[in-house]
Amino acid sequence: MSRVVLAMSGGVDSSVAAHLLLRDGHEVIGVFMRHGEASAAACRIDSDEPQNTNPLNLPVLGDSAGGKRADHKQGCCSATDAADARRVAMSMGIPFYSLDLQEDFRKIVDYFVDDYLAARTPNPCVKCNHWIKFGRLFDYADGVDAEFVATGHYARMVHSNGRSELHRGLDGHKDQSYALFGIDPARLSRMMLPVGDFTKPEIREMATSLGLGVSDKKDSQEICFVTQGHHSDFVKSRRPEMVGATAGEIVTTGGKVVGEHKGFEAFTIGQRKRLGVAMGEPHFVIRIEPDTRRVVIGRAEELLRPGLVADQCNWFVTREELADAQSVGIQIRYNGQPHPGHVVMDGSDPTRMKVMFDDPQAAVAPGQAAVVYDGERVLGGGWITHAIDHIADGSPPPA
């Protein structure tokens, strides 16, 4: 029997994951990671945690509400979520602890804000998985001598012949493997993803049959900490000194000024809605120029790019294994599909790669992840620095 630290969010996926781990005979420790930005007191829950189960000396939240469920509306790990997670853990008889990771999560928020202010499109979920869910949680697991860390992600771990591979989840509509590419390769052998072998309807049905009380709970939103308004409003609230500093012109690809905008952080490559100009036919954001503060718009065909360059690459395979992959596809957005193409690691720096698609792809957005698949298997990926505008324009920029 293995000891497993399970990230419990209070949602249906991690709740059923707890059941599946227990069913398979594991010793489960449930951990709720408190990293939202409402007051810590709003999310305090019962914990009789002995001192030796908190080796990192992270703040452990006690109970200030008499154990009653409170409905604190917060997009990320709310008090309601904490209460739901605790209730599920108690019903299954597993120990449950809440760790205050607000300080760690602030760097996720800062990254999100800084990327938009640099005219990139961030993906905070990927960073959170890397830094917190499969970062800090592993630190905690090491401290309690847990062999594995588990979550409710819709992806699959394939452990065989001494190898550990990350694969797509069985439910193609819910697959989250894209958001896991940044995990330390050395940790794959200690990861467990119990719900990845099921579809979402199957997980909800299982939760109902188990009487968990969270079977009809809504899925979490894409940007968990932006709970109201547009993301640009959140960016301005975090960097009020930048209000007005990113305003500029909206121009066509031909250079014609057609309008003005209040801040380029409100835009992303491929965006069609909320452009603030009427062109008579559909126009999209083609590129954002932070130096001139211009937002360049054009027709759909002007979005197409033959390739991209990425850095900060993380690989689960060797250079030779990448070269030998038979059906490589590159996914460039969370809800997208892999596109066939050719991937080349930088000759001197494996943390950089060039991708050339078999067919040009639309909306290659700097700041987003480019994740490389061989069929169902995740080979690795990196962060898009820029799109390649022409076939000949393929060399990675100088370091």
Swiss-Prot record:
Q: What class of enzyme is it?
A: transferase
Binding positions for ATP per the UniProt entry? A7, M8, S9, G10, G11, V12, D13, S14, M33, G152
The record's GO CC annotations read: cytoplasm
Query: Which residues does this entry assign to the site Interaction with tRNA?
Result: H153, Q368
Any single GO molecular-function term of the entry would be:
tRNA binding
Q: Which Pfam families match?
A: tRNA_Me_trans, tRNA_Me_trans_C, tRNA_Me_trans_M
The reactions it catalyses are: S-sulfanyl-L-cysteinyl-[protein] + uridine(34) in tRNA + AH2 + ATP = 2-thiouridine(34) in tRNA + L-cysteinyl-[protein] + A + AMP + diphosphate + H(+)
A Gene Ontology biological process term: tRNA wobble position uridine thiolation
Where the protein is mainly located, per its record?
Answer: cytoplasm
Record region (Interaction with tRNA): 174-176, 333-334
Q: Which UniProt keywords apply?
A: ATP-binding, Cytoplasm, Disulfide bond, Nucleotide-binding, RNA-binding, Transferase, tRNA processing, tRNA-binding
Catalytic positions?
Answer: C128, C224
* E.C. code: 2.8.1.13
Q: What intrachain disulfides are recorded? A: C128-C224
Q: Which InterPro entries match?
A: MnmA-like, MnmA-like_C, MnmA-like_central, MnmA-like_central_sf, Rossmann-like_a/b/a_fold
Superkingdom assignment: Bacteria
Q: Where in the cell is it found?
A: Cytoplasm
Functional note: Catalyzes the 2-thiolation of uridine at the wobble position (U34) of tRNA, leading to the formation of s(2)U34.
- Similarity comment text for this entry: Belongs to the MnmA/TRMU family.
Question: What name goes with this protein?
Answer: tRNA-specific 2-thiouridylase MnmA
Q: Which organism is it from?
A: Rhodopirellula baltica (strain DSM 10527 / NCIMB 13988 / SH1)
Point out the gene that encodes the protein: mnmA
